[in-house]
Amino acid sequence: MQSRSLGVAVIGAGMVGRSHAAGYRSATTVYGAGLPPVRLVAVADLNAAFAEETARRFGYERFETSWQAVAAADDIDVVSVAVANPLHREISEALLAAGKHVLCEKPLAPSVADAEAMVAAAAKTPDLQACVGFTFRRSPAIAAVREWVETDVIGSPIHLDGFYRCDYAADPDGPMSWRYRGGIGSGALADIGSHLIDLGEFLCGPIASVRGATLATVINERALPAGAVVGHAKSELSDVREPVENEDIAILIALFESGATATLSASRVAFGRANSLGFELFGSRGTAAFDLERPGELQVTNADVLGSTAGRRTVPIGPAHPYLTGGMPMDFPGVGYGQNDLFVFQARAFLEQVVGLKGLPEVPPFATGLHNMRIQGAVVESAARQGAQVDL
């Protein structure tokens, strides 16, 4: 594999698709040599203008207006799928059947049954990478907290208090889109709560059960847009209104196999919090707190600091922490990083998997996405049963 180049494509030219396109563009510039030449071949989107602009902006050779063109292309080996969730299964299965390595955005599918089918399709192509993108695993700060758990810096997890607060849906005049369709559980829970669930297990181990779930919708209908919309952008509205089919807020309690607990809340109507993921992890020997709005630091308290200097302190993230050494043009303390860089780290890790390198932690397989979907399903069941405990 390393004797030949890799052709890369991205399906979806929206907000997340652009992040994947940019990630591949920079992937060969981090962590030294090792990858074969990477060709940025195509960006595909039904909206030709979006596809063309994204391809031009990030240096891809061409744009396409159908995912089928990507699947049929002989010069493409690796594909990111960054489109509406209901399309993930059809596109990913077709790409695997066409011999492409696939990195699919989360949530893996719109239902557990669809996710199971995707895992089965991946099993039929064992020589191909079929992965799901839980990008926050690539955060140097979050990965550092995981290391602190594993090395007993903060001890064994006792309780995780996590949140993901966004306001992309806070405006009732925001246009209707696929994000507001699909039934209960496909809204804030699937869109951003899936990240929280994955991070909970990333830091605390497997979830054994969920309870106390609440799923709430506070904006019950929206107007259809008068034109095309990218990501969470505003647009002119038509006179046609449709009901919102899924939840704006998701809240749950998770119980881990280790005995640890978590309270997790996700909201897409948190006015003033554009993109705020955070947590406080309480361990047997200390505590670590993170907020995506200040991604280059952690708040830490641990039992190794006693007496008059004990207490909460700020730890700046730098070369001593995961991903940064070799992963940034200026990889020394105080430079900082952001969420866009996580897509670069993820793209590099995925390309390494494709060619069989073992440098970075692997991008999780479809099976991890299915597992996450099953936990989401348990949350929906708990909410439907007035917060009853649902075992996994």
Question: Can you say where each PLM-predicted feature lies in the sequence?
Answer:
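Glycine-rich phosphate/pyrophosphate-binding beta-alpha loops
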Residues: S194, S265-A274, G338
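Conserved SAM-binding strand-loop segment of SAM-dependent methyltransferases
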Residues: E61-W67
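C-terminal glycine/acidic-rich active-site capping loop/insertion
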Residues: I219-E247, I251, L255-S258, R285-V363, ...
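Beta-strand-loop-alpha-helix segment that lines the small-molecule cofactor/substrate pocket
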Residues: V78, A84-R137, D152
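Conserved acidic residues
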Residues: V41, E61, D75-D77
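Alpha-helix termini
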Residues: A27-L35, T125, D152, G356-K358
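N-terminal Rossmann-like dinucleotide-binding module
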Residues: M1-F58
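Predominantly a Rossmann-like dinucleotide-binding segment in NAD(P)-dependent oxidoreductases
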Residues: V16, L128, F136-V244, L298, ...
